Each structure stands twice: as C-alpha cells, then as structure tokens.
From Swiss-Prot:
Induction: Expression is positively regulated by the dothistromin-specific transcription factor aflR. The gene is hypC. The lineage of its organism: Eukaryota, Fungi, Dikarya, Ascomycota, Pezizomycotina. Signal peptide: none annotated. Its main location: membrane. Glycans are attached at N129. It holds the Pfam family Anthrone_oxy. The keyword Hydrolase does not apply. One of its GO terms (molecular function) is monooxygenase activity. This is Monooxygenase hypC.
Length: 185
C-alpha cells in the first residue's frame, strides 16, 4: 500500500522527455510568444483606448496632431525593435528545434510574420503617415490645421495600426500552437 502511494508521487519512466528537458525547451519557445503578444497588445491598445480617448477629449487640431506625433515618435522606435527582437527569438527557437529534429518551421514562420509588420508599415501606412507629418508641419509653423482632416487622418492611422498589430499576434498564436504541439509542419 505504501508503495502504491509512493508511485503517485513518482510516476514510472515512460520514455518521454523529463520535466527538466520539457521546461528548458518550452522556455526558449515561450519567450517570443510572450514578447509578440506584448507587442500586439501594446499596439492594439492604441486603437482600442488611446486614439478614441484623444479624439473624444481634444477639440483643437494642433493638439490632436501633436498627441499623434508623440505617440508615433515613441512607437516608431520601440515597435520595430521589439518586433525584430521577437523575430530573432523565434529564429533561435526554430534553430533549437531543428537541432533536436523537431518541427521548426512554425517558429520560422512566426519570425517572418512578426517582422512583416515593418514592411507593412512602409508599404501600406506611408500615405497616412506622410499626410499626418504634413499636417503636423502646418501646426508647427503656427497654423491651426483642419479638424476634420486631422480627425480623419488619426482615425485612419489607428485602423491601420490595428491591422498592423495582427502581425505579431498571428506570430504569437502560431508560436503558441507549435509550443503546445498542436501545429507542426
């Protein structure tokens, strides 16, 4: 009877990976999933919280454009850095998996999808960004700016940013599904 109770706490060796091995493998794979999810959440919070609040509480075009410009300035430095770091972490996880003979391609795809937000910005958001920069330049020279134009541009930028946030989120979902061994290719 005592032996049976002991076996409850010490399961027999089934030939599977030990908890120590599983933990170290999962740790390498979970870190980029966490950073990708963090990046997507930070970006999505702009669309869901920040942009609506500044649109609801700002009545002067120059102030709205200045607030957007500060958001852009911080994001254009931090976002790509986190995206690239996350892509490198996914690449490292893919490399580690390939060394073990495990399915590594989902992590390579996660890396590519996460970093794809950068060229997406250059290609699809350049027009709205440039229009906003021109509007900001007008207000910096003492002009008031046009409320409807400023509001429309900031709304458009927020929507494009929400789409862009789906890149690191997609990478994180694929990375998580691969970590849990639900997806493999």
């Amino acid at each position: 009877m005592l032996r049976a109770a002991t076996n409850l706490y010490s399961p027999p060796n089934t030939g599977k990976m030990s908890p120590k091995t599983i933990g170290s493998d999962v740790g390498i794979e979970v870190i980029p999933v966490m950073t990708g999810t963090f990046l997507s959440g930070a970006m999505m919070s702009l669309f869901l919280l920040t942009i609506p609040v500044i649109l609801e509480t700002t009545t002067v075009p120059s102030q709205l454009l200045n607030q957007w410009h500060r958001i852009f300035y911080r994001g254009h430095i931090q976002g790509p850095l986190i995206s690239i770091a996350t892509g490198l972490l996914y690449s490292y996880a893919a490399y580690q998996r390939s060394q073990r003979g495990a399915a590594w391609k989902p992590f390579a795809v996660s890396a590519a999808v996460t970093v794809a937000m950068i060229p997406f910005t250059w290609v699809f958001m350049a027009n709205v960004n440039n229009s906003l920069f021109r509007a900001v330049a007008v207000t910096e020279k003492g002009g008031e700016g046009n409320w409807n134009e400023a509001q429309g541009l900031v709304r458009s930028w927020g929507a494009w940013n929400a789409v862009r946030a789906l890149f690191p989120l997609s990478g994180a979902v694929l990375g998580l599904l691969s970590t849990c061994k639900i997806v493999s290719f």
